[in-house]
Amino acid sequence: MLPAAMKGLGLVLLAALLCSSPAHGLWCQDCTLTTNSSHCTPKQCHPSDTVCATVWITDPSSSRKDHSVNKMCASSCDFVKRHFFSDYLMGFINSGILKVDVDCCEKDLCNGVAQAGLSPWALAGGLLLSLGPALLWAGP
């Protein structure tokens, strides 16, 4: 039989393995000029992309408050702002024809609808950590 210290170390290593997420690129919602965010789809970003961005373009003069949504991966929030606040669009923005809002975040799918619940691996890890002391005391 293994000594209690070895069981404890094994339990810690197993919990760390279950709670860690695999190394991968950032995932963001992706869509262009849609009026309905449900039309966006998850996309794995390029390794150089560090943020998920959402850009709302609205027509403030419209009684319906027409808008379009763009969601994407990006290397930085500044890059997105430079792109959408380019010289071409600035004429429309300054004249009040368009309003542009940019929001950036750094977690997987953070630019989409809030996700309910937790990862099954995180739940398994939490269960293992909460049952760990009982398993150690139970012994062989």
UniProtKB/Swiss-Prot annotation:
InterPro entries: LY6_UPA_recep-like (IPR016054), LY6H/LY6L_nAChR_modulators (IPR051445), Snake_toxin-like_sf (IPR045860)
GO annotation, biological process: acetylcholine receptor signaling pathway
Keyword Plastid: no
Signal sequence range: 1-25
Membrane topology annotation: Lipid-anchor; GPI-anchor
Swiss-Prot/TrEMBL keywords: Cell membrane, Disulfide bond, Glycoprotein, GPI-anchor, Lipoprotein, Membrane, Signal
Compartments where located: Cell membrane
Superkingdom: Eukaryota
GO molecular function: acetylcholine receptor binding; acetylcholine receptor inhibitor activity
Family annotation (Pfam families): UPAR_LY6 (PF00021)
A GO-annotated cellular component: side of membrane
Disulfide cysteine pairs (residue numbers): C28-C52, C31-C40, C45-C73, C77-C104, C105-C110
Residue intervals of the UPAR/Ly6 domain: 26-91
Glycosylation site positions: N36
Name this polypeptide is given: Lymphocyte antigen 6H
